[in-house]
Amino acid sequence: VFYLKKIYLIRHCESTGQEPKANLTNEGLKQAQELADFLKSKNIEYIVSSPFERAIKSIEPLADYNNLDINIDDRLIEKKLCNKNLNDWMDKLKISFEDLTICYDGGESSNQAMNRGVQVIHELIKLENNNIAVVTHGALLILILKYFDRNIGFSEWKRLLNPDVYLLEFKEDGNKLILKLFMK
């Protein structure tokens, strides 16, 4: 079976927090090196990342190893659930995976977040590069996968690790394959 494109969707490594400038923890820095070691054999030719520090730092070791630039795309930032801290944020997030149109105060709906993430994927498919790394955040990563497989949702989000890697493969005939990759 001939696959036209392989897109590695990557959730960032362990970070010190959720804010855009949050850096990786010491464990996260170690994970970034392990991620690079894991991806070295995948012939990554192009890297695109969320502008958040934790995403960029997660892929830097691979970018250095492959001598690649890290292209920044603001559309890969995390889904904004709402504009304030909620005690029941996990319940609200779960609901947002079921009702993709629901939008909490100052946040964005899952449909809005999904659409901006999927726009990036559709643009990447048109590139000449065949093996592409996309570094993003948990909820957005799952929403991108959900676009291609409606059965994916909250339970997959809950099982995400830092880092985590999913492979999206696109065939010439338009068929797609989603695989969760295990680094260990």
Indicate residue ranges for each PLM-predicted region.
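Short, Lys/Arg-enriched N-terminal segments with co-localized hydrophobic residues
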Residues: V1-Y3
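Active-site-proximal alpha-helix that buttresses catalytic centers in soluble enzyme cores
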Residues: K5-N71, E108-N111
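Generic beta-sheet signal
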Residues: I7, E128-A139
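Short active-site segment of divalent metal-dependent hydrolases/proteases
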Residues: S15, L140-L141
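Phosphate-handling substructures
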Residues: N23, D64-V118
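Glycine-rich phosphate-binding loop signature in dinucleotide/nucleotide-binding domains
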Residues: S41-N43, L124-N130
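Short, well-ordered beta-to-alpha junction loops that form the rim of enzyme active sites
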Residues: P51-F52, R75, V134-A139
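Domain-level recognition of soluble alpha/beta enzyme cores
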Residues: N151-L179
